[in-house]
Amino acid sequence: MSKKISALSAGSLVKLNENGVAKKYIMLGYNHYGKAEVTLLRKDAVGNRAYNACQNGYNVYNGNSLDSFCNEQHIQCLDPIIRACLVNVPIPTTDGHVNGTWSATVRNLMRKCFSLSAAEVGNGGSDGTAFSYLSTQANRIAYQDETTTAVYWWLRSPNSGYNNDAYFVSTDGSVDYDNVYRGYYCARPALALSSEILVSDSADSSGCYTIASAPAGEEYQKVNGVWMRMC
């Protein structure tokens, strides 16, 4: 038996393969961005990277190091059937500082994979709506991949007071801000996926639901546990 992924409650765990290795994602909600999508947040953080490794004093998310990693690099490690089910959604994003000048304008960037905003983790602001699951500090804590070591992870929100700074979630789940070139903070990608994906009817022994089938399933076949595109 299987059921729609949209039927899962917030906080449920779903396994997605990254380069053929199962990783855990947290169900955050359904239709949050108005595209009939489900939003999944990676349970663990991914490596260390700067918010903006190229330009100090430039805390703009659009096209920066963090944005490029999420929407270009991270997507490529997912199984092809999951990539085919990604949904472009409008993520509210504050412009930030450009060459020292602050712009509070919030624009909707179209993204399939992205970093959450300070507003979306319950810290207030105009760049998004909070996910209820992330309203408590404990639920915001992320760990280095497959470890019990809590890490700092970047949000996409720039800080208005300092052109060098952007917001992040600390190891205790609180929200703070720091310099955009800090390379020892982590990315924690969120995915927007089709709500038509079917998952297992119950969680497995690790407490996770697994992908049973997907809208693009007619193009793919599972070979040795990995989804492969059939020509």
Where are the regions that the model predicts?
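Collagenous Gly-X-Y triple-helix signature in extracellular proteins
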Residues: M1-C231
